[in-house]
Amino acid sequence: MAKVEVGLDRVFLGGAHSSIQGKRIGLLTNHTAVDRNGVTAIDRFLARKDCKLVALFAPEHGLYGQQHASEKIKDSKKGEVPIHSLYGANRRPTDAQLKGIDVVVIDIQDIGVRSYTYASSLFYMMEEAVKRNIEVVVLDRPNPINGLTVDGPMLHPKWRSFIGYINVPYIHGMTLGELAEFFNTEYKVSAKLTVIPMKGWKRGMDFKETGMQWIPTSPNIPESDTPLFYATTGLLGELRLCNIGVGYTLPFKLIGAPWMNAEQLSRYLNSQGLGGVRFTPLYFKPFSGSMAQLDCQGVLIQVVDKKTYKPFAVQGVLIGAIKSLYPQKFKEVMSHIGKSEKDLFCKAVGSEEPLQFLKEDKLVGWQIAEFQRAERELFMEKRKNYLRPEYAEDYRPNL
């Protein structure tokens, strides 16, 4: 098994720390930022004598990851170091919070999906740092989905928000460090940016191949493969069409409802010729959240080949299947979705066009799956400029 060294390892255990020596540090991080010995970035910085940790910045879910999605978080302290919440009264650091900081270091485990907000906190921080001539250092970590899968629509400027801040596909196949460099150049941010890359990570790696231990990034992302399923059913959750395993033991890994027929749905989905996935009938009872304590039927989504699996394409077929097999329930649920829910869906998906597809009478699955293919292909060409060469499968260092 590979032993990947993340950016944090290389800064403190590998000697690549000239960018922080003698500096006053602001650290955007949370509980996921640990080195190969399980020591957190916070503790590493607190223990250093050649730099000073003067402020902590916490993203959505809080510094310790215990807050649920959309819960506001107050400022607090860790010892004498202030913890500034970037998911409370404000989502951007203020003048007062950045005062006295020479370098902002960002170390956080992202999940590789545009609508997950950790990347947006990084982008906001970069924009605020450059206004104040503060350097930015990103300590890179793996994309847990992998660095090859690119799927889903781009982001239309109309729907730019905290759950989708830059124009990349819904599943972008980039690390947080690569996204930072993309944002810095393509959006002309021009921050003084340093990315400390990983050593030993390759784009095709499954997270379990890295030798790292997965730390849940938030309450409903408990396992290293959950991000792949978040990319598969998360938008279904925004539409509230059915239960997606949140409130049960398998968040994002299933779809189901009291009005579904498990055998019928699994047969239909398995007949669609989708690559890398199979659907198994499932009977379950959510213990909280959507459809709590109701007997539900649906399917367990089982990815059998991650290299051919396209999560957003599968999501389109799932929506199409529900509309095709249960048209009256589909119509009923969609009729009760208000403007705020529709807007949230459009912000997450990056466009209002998929919502228009859902209103059509015909089967919509493949329309959504193929949506914006040409735009995605153009992005793939641009993306090549920001992929770190050492992460390539065939990379050989110049010696």
Predicted regions and their residues:
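Glycine-rich, charge-decorated loop segments at or immediately adjacent to ligand/cofactor-binding or catalytic sites
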Residues: 65-69, 137-159
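Conserved anion/nucleotide-ligand pocket segment
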Residues: 160-232
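Short internal beta-strands
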Residues: 52-60, 139
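Conserved functional hotspot residues or short segments at active or partner-binding sites
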Residues: 256-371
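N-terminal phosphate-binding or glycine-rich loops at protein starts, especially the Walker A/P-loop
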Residues: 4-51
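Glycine/threonine-rich flexible loop motifs
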Residues: 110-122
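Glycine-rich, aromatic-lined ligand/substrate-binding cores of catalytic
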Residues: 201-289
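Glycine-rich oxoanion-binding loops at beta->alpha junctions
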Residues: 70-101, 113
